[in-house]
Each structure stands twice: as structure tokens, then as C-alpha cells.
């Protein structure tokens, strides 16, 4: 029997591709998505995606969704307490691992691993340190469909928001902008 894992779901392309990679590798079984939703806005905390879209994504993936509601602003103590509660429920269901779509940020990885260790759980990172030009090409070539919902205006013109994440989008990116938004 395969190990059962939750996938931390930001509602973005990296989470979607992490799900694809995990399913393709066929070593563990993703049994649910885990997402933080900011209470006053009723949106995914990471990307600001509406909750209805989040729920449609989970349905399209064929996976149950665990929504961890957090306030805004959310002090770390509240965030961590609510995540511990969600992990307690997951552990009761026999889940001991959470997968993340993170690519590079060592401090975020260490934070996730340390918090999971406190509740006797582990983390996996299927996209970790993959070269982003290769990863972007694999996503587009593999049929991933995504729409850019936010951009950093210090890095990229606002006109890129609302575009499909496709070969045309990647070709139009300035050379100094990471194709995965890192």
C-alpha cells in the first residue's frame, strides 16, 4: 500500500504541477488538498483566488479539500495552531506526510519541515530545485493550463496579469524575469 499524503495547495501552477509529478511518479498517493483561506476575504491566502475557484480545482483534481481558515492579518501563533489542528485530523486518518510545490526558498522549506516535525509528520518537495526554465517548459508542454492572476509590478508589467501561462507568455517574459515567478 502506498503512503498517503496531503498536498499543500496554493491554487497555483506549482501546486498543480507538483500534483502531476507526484501522480506520475506513482510512489505515494495524494489523498487530499490542504489550503489556507483568509477569512475576511474568503480567498486562498497565497494567491487571492476566490474560494469557489479553489473548490472547483479540488473537484477537478478529484480530491477532498481541507480548508484551514485564518484571519487577516494572521500572526504566526494563530497560523501554526490552526495548522496543527488540521495535521491532527490528517494523522487520525493515517496521513504522515505533506507535499509542497516549493522550488527554492530554503527558509520556507526549513519552516515547513520544522512545523511538521513537531506533530511527527514529514514533508516532500517534488519540484525542489528544478531549473525553472526546464520546469516552465515541462508545464506548458505537459498541458498545464493556468492563468496569471497576479504579478509583481516591480518585475513585470501589469499587462501580463490575466494571460494564459503558455509558450507565448513565456516567450514574452523579459530575460531577467524567472519563468516560474521565483
Regions found by a protein language model. Name each.
Residues 1-182:
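Nucleotide-activated chemistry modules centered on ATP-dependent adenylation/adenylyltransferase
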Amino acid at each position: 500500500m502506498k503512503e498517503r499524503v496531503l498536498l499543500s495547495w496554493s491554487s497555483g501552477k506549482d501546486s498543480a504541477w507538483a500534483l502531476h509529478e507526484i501522480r506520475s511518479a506513482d510512489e505515494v498517493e495524494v489523498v487530499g488538498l490542504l489550503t489556507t483561506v483568509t477569512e475576511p476575504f474568503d480567498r486562498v491566502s497565497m494567491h487571492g483566488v476566490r474560494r469557489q475557484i479553489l473548490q472547483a480545482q479540488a473537484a477537478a483534481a478529484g480530491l477532498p479539500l481541507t480548508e484551514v481558515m485564518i484571519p487577516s492579518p494572521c500572526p504566526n501563533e494563530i497560523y501554526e495552531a490552526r495548522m496543527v489542528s488540521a495535521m491532527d485530523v490528517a494523522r487520525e486518518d493515517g496521513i504522515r506526510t505533506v507535499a509542497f510545490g516549493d522550488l527554492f526558498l530554503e527558509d520556507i522549506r526549513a519552516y515547513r519541515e520544522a512545523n511538521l516535525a513537531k506533530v511527527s509528520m514529514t514533508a516532500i518537495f517534488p519540484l525542489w530545485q528544478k531549473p525553472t526554465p526546464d520546469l516552465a517548459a515541462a508545464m506548458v508542454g505537459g498541458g498545464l493550463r493556468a492563468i496569471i492572476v497576479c504579478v509583481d509590478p516591480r518585475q513585470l508589467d501589469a499587462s501580463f496579469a490575466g494571460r494564459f501561462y503558455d509558450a507565448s507568455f513565456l516567450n514574452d517574459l523579459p530575460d531577467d524575469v524567472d519563468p516560474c515567478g521565483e
